[in-house]
Curated annotation (Swiss-Prot):
Keywords: Copper, Electron transport, Magnesium, Membrane, Metal-binding, Mitochondrion, Mitochondrion inner membrane, Phosphoprotein, Respiratory chain, Translocase, Transmembrane, Transmembrane helix, Transport. Its cofactor is Cu cation. Component of the cytochrome c oxidase (complex IV, CIV), a multisubunit enzyme composed of 14 subunits. The complex is composed of a catalytic core of 3 subunits MT-CO1, MT-CO2 and MT-CO3, encoded in the mitochondrial DNA, and 11 supernumerary subunits COX4I, COX5A, COX5B, COX6A, COX6B, COX6C, COX7A, COX7B, COX7C, COX8 and NDUFA4, which are encoded in the nuclear genome. It comes from Chrysocyon brachyurus. Residues 1-14, 88-227 are mitochondrial intermembrane. Component of the cytochrome c oxidase, the last enzyme in the mitochondrial electron transport chain which drives oxidative phosphorylation. The respiratory chain contains 3 multisubunit complexes succinate dehydrogenase (complex II, CII), ubiquinol-cytochrome c oxidoreductase (cytochrome b-c1 complex, complex III, CIII) and cytochrome c oxidase (complex IV, CIV), that cooperate to transfer electrons derived from NADH and succinate to molecular oxygen, creating an electrochemical gradient over the inner membrane that drives transmembrane transport and the ATP synthase. Its main location: mitochondrion. The keyword Metal-binding applies. Belongs to the cytochrome c oxidase subunit 2 family. Signal peptide: none annotated. The gene is MT-CO2. This is Cytochrome c oxidase subunit 2. Residues 46-59 are mitochondrial matrix. Binds a dinuclear copper A center per subunit. The modification Phosphotyrosine is found at Y218.
Length: 227
């Protein structure tokens, strides 16, 4: 959940998002150390007269500033590649949901059930109830079981869209004629909000996504009522 004037990322709900947060902190630490070193060198050069203005060759220094950046890039690339492969991994999903983007709403189909599908439209501001979020509430939430691997198949009926839920670390393009795949797993129950993250027309800002993660027993009851 995002908060007003929030400077950091949303709290992680999935293992992938937790890894992304760790990688974010790891990368920022490296950037902070490099920036501090560069600022220190610049300030030292500006405040002291002990500088070599006639140096023509310094093999040792050139070797250091060639090898050191290479090591830093490796330290950034290794955890990044690890997370990339984790995001592409699919291990026997317990449930598959097909998501279709439209101008300007989402439709969902639970492919493991014979007739469980619905459209999800944004609730207009004038119809919101007290406590509901403007531009983020929908008439039909996507109810999913927590602590289970869920596969999302994402495509579009018309133009480019993008299905994104920040707290789960998800952002997958919805492309007409192409079926993209992503997996998700929420570690705790709750409501998780997202939006279309690809400019898709005049009502692009009015395509919210709401995932309701619930215990398996509640999901089974809900799915039985929906079917």
């Amino acid at each position: 959940m995002a908060y007003p004037f929030q400077l950091g990322l949303q709290d992680a709900t999935s293992p992938i998002m937790e890894e992304l947060l760790h990688f974010h902190d790891h990368t920022l630490m490296i950037v902070f150390l490099i920036s501090s070193l560069v600022l220190y060198i610049i300030s030292s050069m500006l405040t002291t007269k002990l500088t070599h203005t006639s140096t023509m060759d310094a093999q040792e220094v050139e070797t250091v500033w060639t090898i050191l950046p290479a090591i830093i890039l490796v330290l950034i690339a290794l955890p990044s590649l690890r997370i990339l492969y984790m995001m592409d991994e699919t291990n026997n999903p317990s449930l598959t949901v097909k998501t279709m983007g439209h101008q300007w709403y989402w439709s969902y189909e639970y492919t493991d059930y014979e007739d469980l599908n619905f459209d999800s439209y944004m609730i207009p501001t004038q119809e919101l109830k007290p406590g509901e979020l403007r531009l983020l509430e929908v008439d039909n939430r996507v109810v999913l079981p927590m602590e289970m691997t869920i596969r999302m198949l994402i495509s579009s009926e018309d133009v480019l869209h993008s299905w994104a839920v920040p707290s789960l670390g998800l952002k997958t393009d919805a492309i007409p004629g192409r079926l993209n795949q992503t997996t998700l797993m929420a570690m705790r129950p709750g409501l998780y909000y997202g939006q279309c993250s690809e400019i898709c027309g005049s009502n692009h800002s009015f395509m919210p996504i709401v995932l309701e993660m619930v215990p398996l027993s509640y999901f089974e009851t809900w799915s039985a009522l929906m079917v």
